[in-house]
Amino acid sequence: GFAGKLATANIVVNGLIKYRSDQETYGRFDYWATAAETIARGAGDCEDFAILKQTMLRAMGVPDKSLTIIVLRDNSRDLYHAVLGVSTNQGNLILDNVRDQIASDTQIPQYQPLFSFSGSRSWIHGTRKGSSTPIETSQQPTAKIAPDESIPAPALSISLPLSELRASIQ
């Protein structure tokens, strides 16, 4: 069933792909690899795991509208990270390269979403200063965010605009 597809994609990709930074793999600070590139190299960073899981689940018949790449801040590890979110009728599930167990987004409160995209749709997440009310848009540039588990969040910068990131996973 559906849960089996999610578990299979998460466990297979986590077991098949070795974590390696973009600098080590591609000689670049940040590179969003296609699923084929990640498989060919047998390695990738967190967003490469998420892209490969997304591609695998699409091939298994999971609707694209249910699959979302989420770039977030992991407040417990003080870094930026990327995961695959899966929207279900029972809430949002997170497929993560740091754990084989699939978790509900509510089970990972240290993950603060920054931006996400699914197909041709994209979102910027956040709250207004001094408020817990989510905002719809942001004036904050996303050009300084690059998910990578091995680099502390304050030192990150991204080398691709969101439109190019979306194009690389389609």
Predicted regions and their residues:
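A structural boundary/capping signal
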Residues: 1-170
